[in-house]
């Protein structure tokens, strides 16, 4: 189960994402590193909360979706595929008891093979599963995670990077446009043609020699 894509985990999980009280104390800065096994529970909760609703008719499926995301992510982290990275942003929260790191966001980057309908070309770096804790949104976390992905793609020797966004996700589209992504292709979809579902847009960014600019 890819969002975009331990039985004890089926029980109610208390997220370790940054709380509003902690942010009120002082969110001074955050760091980005590769995800580790101990991050799995927090990452699964953040991804499920970002892409699935806990209310309504599908609310009952939330724990199952969360477990599926947990298992898929665990398998990817264990993989020996050379061109795959899951990154996490850790907020450094300062309070009366001192400072500590808490999960603020995550993103994955891997090489992707072209779909059958796409022009024939070799694999390309593809960004997926970008998610930010609700408490840390509009603080530059997503932008810094994207920049880290761009640096990774550049380190791998690729001149371009790609990602998908739904045409009706205006906030995400605005972020990507501001960070230099451009429309590469509108993905064909029977759901969009027949059912009025939003189209998926494939965006591309050409990477400069200094991708962190």
Task: Put a short name on every predicted segment.
Residues 142:
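Conserved phosphate/oxyanion-binding catalytic-loop motifs
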Residues 133-135, 139, 167-168:
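Active-site acidic-Proline motif in GNAT/NAT acetyltransferases
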Residues 2-30, 34-135, 146-148, 152, ...:
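Acetyl-CoA-dependent GNAT
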Residues 40, 138, 172-173:
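Internal amphipathic alpha-helical segments of the cytochrome P450 catalytic fold
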Residues 159-162, 166-173, 178-213:
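C-terminal "cap" of GNAT-fold acetyltransferases
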Residues 137, 154, 177:
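Short polybasic/polar patches that bind polyanions
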Residues 146, 153-164:
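Conserved GNAT acetyl-CoA-binding A-motif
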């Amino acid at each position: 189960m890819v969002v975009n894509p331990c039985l004890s985990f089926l029980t109610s999980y208390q997220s370790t994402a940054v709380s509003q009280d902690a942010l009120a104390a002082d969110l001074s800065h955050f760091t980005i590193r590769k995800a580790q096994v101990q991050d799995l529970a927090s990452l699964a909760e953040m991804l499920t909360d970002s892409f699935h609703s806990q209310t309504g008719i599908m609310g009952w499926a939330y724990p199952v979706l969360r477990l599926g995301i947990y298992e898929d992510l665990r398998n990817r982290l264990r993989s020996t595929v050379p061109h795959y990275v899951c990154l996490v942003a850790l907020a450094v929260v300062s309070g009366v008891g001192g400072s500590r790191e808490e999960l603020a966001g995550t993103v994955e980057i891997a090489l992707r093979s072209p779909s059958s309908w796409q022009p024939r070309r070799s694999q390309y770096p593809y960004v997926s599963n970008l998610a930010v804790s609700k408490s840390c949104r509009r603080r530059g976390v997503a932008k810094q995670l994207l920049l880290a992905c761009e640096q990774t793609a550049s380190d791998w020797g690729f001149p371009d990077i790609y990602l998908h966004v739904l045409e009706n996700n205006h906030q995400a589209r605005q972020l990507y446009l501001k960070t230099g992504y451009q429309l590469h292709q509108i993905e064909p979809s029977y759901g969009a043609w027949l059912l009025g579902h939003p189209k998926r847009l494939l965006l591309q960014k050409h990477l400069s020699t200094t991708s962190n600019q």
